Amino acid sequence: MRDEVPSCSLAILTAQIKTSSTGVQVNPSDHNTVLATYSQASPQDVKTAIDAALAAKPEWESLPFADRAAVFLKAADLISGKYRYDLMAATMLGQGKNAWQAEIDAAAELIDFLRFNVQFAEELYAQQPAHNSPGVWNRTEYRPLEGFVYAISPFNFTAIGGNLSAAPALMGNVVLWKPSDFAIASNWLLYNILLEAGLPKNVIQFIPGNPEEVTREILAHPQFASLHYTGSTAVFRKLYGQIGAGVAEGRYRSYPRIVGETGGKNFHLIHASADIENAAIQTVRGAFEYQGQKCSATSRVYVPASIWPQFKSRLVDEVKKLQVGNPWESKNFIGPVIHAASFKKLSGAIDAAKEDKDLELLVGGTYDDSKGYFVHPTVYEAKTPDHKLFSTELFGPILTAYVYDDTKDPVAAFSSACDLVDSTSEYGLTGSVFASDRAAVRFAEEKLRNSAGNFYINCKSTGAVVGQQPFGGSRASGTNDKAGSINILTRFVSMRSIKEEFNATTKVEYPSNE
């Protein structure tokens, strides 16, 4: 696949359309290598895509659920077999994932999303009124939304691109899918797998393009019904505001459903009773898997002074072992960051740290973009708990540690550490506590109940599994609608209660009138 350069078209009006405006996706491990070229949607293309999707909506939503489900179940089978390695390769080359990370994303998680969503939908449709009065039949209909769904997917998970577009479509909606420019190759392959599985071509419109231009046309349309988004907090807040302004103007036929999962400044909180080896190894994995480019990645760790020397030693030793290089070479744990802008942001943070007296570099601190965008895993110890590295999301392989003093009053120190965890960051996505003392676990679980939508005990802050740990957070991290659960599907249906009476009413008066 490294020697092939696919051309990715728009997918509008049952045709693949090539436009005069094009972009390229490069291999982040070798930024001189073009992985894919793609057409960019113009404002008129977006309008055409909306019209095509809405024209396809009546037939698609009227299909029996079993027929819609069959499409996505077949797609899951195609991904599990025929296209597994192609999709993994596109993810490895285009998004910089090693084989393990590509497998658990582009294969396993994507397949799980497609299959579990069918099960969740069946369970949702089965939720019917618990009681019928004599002579009355009550039922609930789960209607697709009136209009279309706008799905904006990120670069870092092929599975998310699939879920953002496929989940609403499964429920009978039509979708305009804007993929990340940095995941075009894998997302285009996935789109074509859905078509091969039997998805009507106009149900999901594949529209790469300038984000602001595409979004402007979509949010201006009166039949915009929902946003399904994963990406940065800043962009989500902007979109939320634009949609709110549209609601205030009376622009939309209904109130759009807004579903978003954004950033995180995820924590590991270590208690003095923790298994030090486990806590250190889990922290390395949580921070540096996929170069820290997961919204759930561990980026801050709080360690008690009583075990800091042992923890630091093991942490640094493990980080030093990590191999950095091309993701298709099996020895490498760390691959490239996704693009030049990310590299610039991360290398800038490393450069700034060199002059920062409140930071001590423990390991790493190097980078190289001569061929690919490589940033070596880096760990700092901060002398102050309010350092900006504890609150600024960098989205890369940089971890910051703070050592809290537990030598005088361990219980009070752990409580204060919980307060730090909760108050330092605006996010609320994921976090972990490491302790063998059950009282400490229980204390942290309660104290940090709003600090993380996914809370882990004695395991890393990453790795939510569909059907096991529904994923999402609140505060600045999103709407917490929980991908990988039945809850997310409720956001893409509109319930209608239907009451039918079998017996005629014969008089106006109440029994009390007699």
Report each predicted region and the residues it spans.
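Hydrophobic face of amphipathic alpha-helices that form TPR/SEL1-like repeat modules
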Residues: 1-35
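Glycine-rich loop-to-alpha-helix module at the N-terminal edge of alpha/beta enzyme cores
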Residues: 31-125, 411, 415-423
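Conserved C-terminal structural/oligomerization subdomain of aldehyde/semialdehyde dehydrogenase
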Residues: 29-37, 55, 61-66, 70-72, ...
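Rossmann-like NAD(P) dinucleotide-binding subdomain of oxidoreductase/dehydrogenase enzymes
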Residues: 121-278, 480
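Short linear capping/connector segments at secondary-structure termini
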Residues: 90-97, 130-134, 329-335
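Hydrophobic face of alpha-helices
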Residues: 47-50, 69-76, 84, 88, ...
